[in-house]
Every structure is written in C-alpha cells, then in structure tokens.
C-alpha cells in the first residue's frame, strides 16, 4: 500500500514538473527595463535604426554619450552603472519618425538553445504630435552564452 502511494506521489510530482517553463519564466523575470521612450534630437544623436547587444562597459558608455549629445536622456534611466560580469544590455532603436506617438516594445524569452527578442514597433492611434522622435527601448538581461536572436 505504501509503495502504491509512493509511486502515485512520484508520478504526480514528475508530471507537474515544468522545468522548461520555469526556466523561461525565471529568465524573463531577469529582464530589467532601464528606459524606453523617444529621443527628441531629430536624429542629431547619430543613432540609426538598430538592435544592440552590449556586453562591455566601454560600449555602454559610448552609447550613453551619444544618447546625451542633444538632451540628457540618461537622467531618466533606472540605472546606468551596469555590472557587465552579470548582465548584458539590449538596446533597440527605431528610425527617426516625423511625428510622435511611436514606441518600441520588447518581449524577451530564453530558450534552451537561444534567447529570442521579439521587437514590436507601435504606431500612434489617431492624432500625434508634430515633432520628430526616435523610439527606443533599453533593458538589461542576465548574462548568457546563448546566442541572441532578434525577430
């Protein structure tokens, strides 16, 4: 009788183990938003539409210098002192837009063989401001040796 109960308990636990889902969930929880919004320098920052994977402090400092070249954008960041031994920074920039209301969203998911970053570019609903903007999204993720794929 005890063997049957023990066997049922083992089977129950084995069927409820969702290690792959839990790993993905834990990886997604490791995504920390640093900043998202728009640059208002009409492209004067010199940042083209791109997806960046920043693994070194020097590259991060160079990006911050560019971002702050017109307006002090990094003042609104949740953090700028990144520990690159533990984290990688993901930065996505859209093209310069001729009006406001645009945004960029990221959905970052870790899988067993790669990290996938789904980039969604949103357009304004209805009327938008008549100012040139450049949407961006910057986040840090736990450092990994897995390849990073943008979609």
Where are these regions (language model features)?
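Exposed, flexible binding/inhibitory loops of compact, secreted disulfide-stabilized domains
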Residues: 17-151
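Bacterial Sec-dependent N-terminal signal peptides
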Residues: 1-26
């Amino acid at each position: 009788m005890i063997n049957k109960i023990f066997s049922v308990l083992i089977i129950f636990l084995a069927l409820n183990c969702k290690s792959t889902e839990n790993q993905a969930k834990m990886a997604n929880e490791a995504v920390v938003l640093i900043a998202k919004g728009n640059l208002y320098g009409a492209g004067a920052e010199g940042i083209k539409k791109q997806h960046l994977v920043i693994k070194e402090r020097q590259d991060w400092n160079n990006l911050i210098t560019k971002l702050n070249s017109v307006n002090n954008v990094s003042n609104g960041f949740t953090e700028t002192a990144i520990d690159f031994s533990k984290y990688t920074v993901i930065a996505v920039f859209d093209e310069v837009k001729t009006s406001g209301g645009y945004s960029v969203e990221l959905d970052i998911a870790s899988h067993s063989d790669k990290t996938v970053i789904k980039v969604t570019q949103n357009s304004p609903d209805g009327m938008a401001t008549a100012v040139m903007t450049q949407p961006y999204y910057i986040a840090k993720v736990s450092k990994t040796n897995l390849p990073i794929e943008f979609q």
